Amino acid sequence: MIPPRIVPWRDFAELEELKLWFYPKSKGTIEDKRQRAVQRVQSYRLKGSQYLPHVVDSTAQITCAVLLDEKEACLGVHQDSIPIRLSYVMALIRFVNGLLDPTQQSQFAIPLHTLAAKIGLPSWFVDLRHWGTHERDLPGLEMLRWAANEALSWLYDHYWNDEELEDDRDDDDDDDDTGYGYRRNDKLEKYMESLTKTLDKWKRLRNEFLEYKWVWENANDSLITSSNFSGDNLVNYDAEKRKSSHASSSETMIRENLRQWQELWKLSIYHNVVLEKFFNNYDPLLLKVLMLNLNNFDWKVIEWVARNYRTQQDDSNITTILKRKFNAWKELQKRLLDVIINNLNNKNFKNKWQNWEKLIDENASYLILYFCQSMLAKLETEKITGNSWRNKKRRKQIDSTVEIEAKLKENIDNLSLRFNEGEIKLYDFIPAEKDSVPLKKEVSPALKADTNDILGDLASLKQRMSSFGTVGKKNKQEENRATPVKNWSRVQNWKPKPFGVL
């Protein structure tokens, strides 16, 4: 359950009003309320800056820079004035830093381009931030105006017009028929439609995903320096565009498809919908793509698999999606579990150990036992094959790997006492039916009688074996008591002889 959060606005209606002030529905609005929106955000800040979300504050700061630019333009001041450029640069730098700094939670610094790719922020914002911070000359005014407009558009798409806000508002106004938004069933239908289109597009682009792996395997985008914004390379732009038009178009389509997956995954209430759709159309390549590009997809998919596996093991009359796609344990192990484990990032596994530990505790099974054993072996292999200078550095620091390995070993010991390879035979024994819930077959009385006879014979045989074992133990104990215990003594007049000679 998500804990409640203190916000400076009274209700969602007030936030909706602020949104309309920042982003009027029509540009020809008679009364421009952007200045009033900036003032309202300033009043929110007086209530406590810790309660004000960064995206709201950043929207106000960028809008303030835009208003200052428009004001000086109306007064006829020189267009390339330093105060306006500094105002734009500072607002954009704070915009980027406020988005990326909270995601910098690793033990070692992660490149900002990687963090930007995870949240869907275009990489050129990172380069513009670097240019405004470290370069000798500030970016041009036209470039800054365009960047501010793009930043406001990004904030609108990822926050102000986010469906999660609509979900929260609809929860409060569930019985309201005023025409705002659409009901949850309609949302699910539209979500499923978008999910189906995204999946179909991925199927069409599968060959491109195989050919241009570097686009989705490496989150780092190519750096853009200040020369990219100066216009010096525009002379050869058409030639370069014709030369690599196919590659650039494929790269664009791949990035667009990844962005669609990320937008769908942002709504946590539909995670199970995405996972069910994914497993109904299972592809190892798509699994790798989503694990590398969707936040928390790795442990979410393991959690879904573990729950499906336990449901299948607990009730043999139910055929889960997992059983229909992977009928035998070896198939499940090679085509799914090993793919997940091989593509699981060890650093992410350590950083999010709390999530993994909770998953292991709540979904105990032989599948989780296999997962723990494989991850322990993977972590130990990484420790052996790591670079020497990294190992020296790790010795000086408190490394959480030792603690995680100890907990994994403890979980393995506990799970080994409860589960064994007999679960594999049970999983293989259950047939994969087409129907999700097959009908129970009635057993004939004759078959019941035969079964009871067999079970009775087995019980009597077990009793005889146990009684025979107790008798054998008693006989051995009596023999041991009958034979006296003698101490070792040296043999007198012993002469060594060759083997075979008496």
UniProtKB/Swiss-Prot annotation:
One of its GO terms (biological process) is maturation of LSU-rRNA. GO terms for cellular component: cytoplasm; Las1 complex; mitochondrion; nucleolus; nucleus; preribosome, large subunit precursor. It comes from the Eukaryota. Disulfide bonds: none annotated. InterPro entries: Las1. It is found in: Nucleus; Mitochondrion. Residues 469-489 are annotated as: Disordered. Keywords: Mitochondrion, Nucleus. GO terms for molecular function: endonuclease activity. Belongs to the LAS1 family. Regulates cell surface growth, bud formation and morphogenesis. May act indirectly by regulating factor(s) involved in these processes. Present with 647 molecules/cell in log phase SD medium. This is Protein LAS1. The gene is LAS1.
